[in-house]
Every structure is written in structure tokens, then in C-alpha cells.
Regions:
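Non-catalytic, conserved peripheral segments adjacent to functional cores
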Residues: 1-108, 122-161
Length: 161
């Protein structure tokens, strides 16, 4: 991370944004902001917020959406977040981003539509990941694509947790 808390050593996929967060110590514990509109430059609203529990060592991959913008925040545990830009015509086509975030190093990761993403729990206990999407899940017509974690369409192999 740079002095401005920007990721070093990797080119961010076009449209991906990362905002690292600092805990605010309080007499009763700590406060952690998950999302503020002024952190990021997108004007997309938040239409749905949900939390996913990911068991120790487990992987949920690969996911992408045609239109939905994901905003992922790890509220508990430690995870590896991997992104792959398979968008033809994107200036970062073929780029992979990898981040290690969690309760001790919190961050908001914004993932644009059509970018494949996967999450691996690298800790020894259940991780909880909050997602704040700009389009609520439509049960009748889901905007959700899924391929297996070991798919040859994504050139990344998750290491053992």
C-alpha cells in the first residue's frame, strides 16, 4: 500500500476501486464505516445489502453480472478477493487483481459489471462478507453468471488456504 493507501504492484482493473478503511477506537469498542458515497466516484445507489458467510477454507467463485455493480466489504474473518477482467475491449482485458482483506485490514472493493470475481476464506473460522449492490437481486430474472472455481475461462488457481 502506498502512503495514500493505494494498492502497489498491480494495475487495477478498469472500473475497480479499492478504499481501505481505518477502525475508529471508542471507549465502548470500535466503529468501522462500511460505505460512504463520498469515498468513491460512482453515482450508483445502493438497492440491496446482503451478507454472505463463507466457511473456513472455502471458496465462492466465479461470479459476474451483466449490469450489477458489487461493493464488497469483509466484516469478519480474512479473505482473498480475486478479480478477472474478461471484458473484450477493456483497456485491462486479461488483468487479474488479488486483495487480502478482513476485519483487521478492512476495505471496500467496488467491482464493475462483467468482471469475474471470487472470494476465498483464508482464515481459520467463518468469514462474513457484506455486499452493497446497486441493483437488487431479481429472482424472476437474475443478473448473475456463475462458473466453477476451477474453470479454464479464468486463468487463476486459488492456493490452499
Amino acid at each position: 500500500m502506498s502512503a495514500r493507501w493505494e494498492p502497489l504492484g498491480q494495475t487495477l482493473i478498469n472500473g475497480v476501486r479499492v478504499h481501505e478503511v481505518r477502525h475508529v477506537p471508542k471507549g465502548s469498542g470500535r466503529l468501522t464505516e462500511l460505505y460512504r458515497r463520498d469515498w468513491l466516484t460512482d453515482d450508483a445507489g445502493v438497492d440491496q445489502v446482503f451478507q454472505v458467510e463463507l466457511l473456513a477454507g472455502r471458496i465462492t467463485a466465479w461470479h459476474a453480472h451483466a449490469q450489477t455493480l458489487d461493493r464488497i466489504f469483509v466484516s469478519e474473518g480474512s479473505v482473498r478477493i480475486v478479480l478477472y477482467d474478461a471484458r473484450q475491449g477493456s483497456p485491462t482485458f486479461g488483468t487479474i487483481n488479488q486483495f487480502l482483506f478482513g476485519e483487521h485490514r478492512p476495505a471496500l472493493v467496488v467491482i464493475p459489471p462483467r468482471v469475474w470475481h471470487g472470494v476465498q476464506n483464508i482464515g481459520g473460522r467463518t468469514a462474513r462478507v457484506v455486499n452493497m449492490v446497486d441493483r437488487a437481486y431479481d429472482y424472476a430474472s437474475p443478473d448473475h453468471w456463475r462458473i466453477p472455481a476451477d474453470s479454464p475461462h479464468v486463468p487463476f488457481t486459488f492456493p490452499p488456504a
